[in-house]
């Protein structure tokens, strides 16, 4: 299957493409974000992945243009630390087969970001905060085994920096939930 990865950083893009190729996935990529739907046709791809550094308005415009080119193409928001696993799971159809969690949301409340998730099956959870500054910074907020039922984690606002941030929740080592926060 052919995949197109759209990202901001040439180095990161090459690492993601190499990881996909190691899994037997034909991977193409571009850092010419604004021209992606002109330079590539979604009919040539099973999946188009958008990296976390792609600005939201540009991402939405590209998704619309790619959807017009190929209504069946999978359009996936992802980011570097999980991109290879995330893309491979999407190609297998695993993203629709959530085994561990459902209803994921992140809200802001009294100086913190609250992560809420309905856990359907007990397992391990890891909550991480990523920040893209001069390089990608990661901090594990919480890592533990949890029972089924409602799950909540609090991320203090001091962990969220100026610029692009991602909150990543991994359930059972294989299900990914993430939320993008851009702070000025």
Describe every region a protein language model picked out.
Residues 65-101:
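Ser/Thr/Gly-rich flexible loops in soluble cytosolic domains mediating phosphotransfer, phosphorylation
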Residues 35-37:
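Short alpha-helical segment
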Residues 155, 161-175:
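Short, aromatic- and glycine-rich surface loops/edge beta-strands on solvent-exposed regions
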Residues 50-65:
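Conserved phosphotransfer microenvironments
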């Amino acid at each position: 299957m052919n995949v197109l990865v759209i990202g901001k950083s040439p180095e990161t893009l090459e690492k993601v493409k190499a990881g996909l190729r190691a899994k037997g996935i034909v991977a193409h990529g571009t850092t010419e974000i604004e021209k992606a739907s002109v330079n590539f046709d979604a009919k040539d791809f099973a999946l188009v992945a958008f990296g976390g550094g792609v600005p939201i308005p540009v991402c939405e415009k590209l998704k619309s243009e790619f959807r017009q080119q190929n209504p069946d193409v999978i359009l996936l928001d992802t980011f570097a630390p999980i991109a290879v696993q995330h893309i491979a799971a999407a190609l297998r159809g695993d993203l629709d087969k959530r085994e561990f969690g459902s209803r994921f949301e992140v809200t802001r409340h009294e100086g913190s970001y609250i992560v809420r998730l309905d856990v359907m099956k007990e397992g391990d959870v890891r909550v991480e905060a990523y920040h893209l500054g001069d390089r990608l910074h990661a901090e594990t907020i919480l890592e533990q085994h949890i029972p089924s039922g409602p799950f909540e984690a609090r991320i203090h606002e001091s962990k969220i920096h100026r610029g692009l941030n991602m909150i990543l929740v991994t359930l059972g080592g294989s299900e990914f939930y993430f939320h993008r926060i851009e702070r000025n």
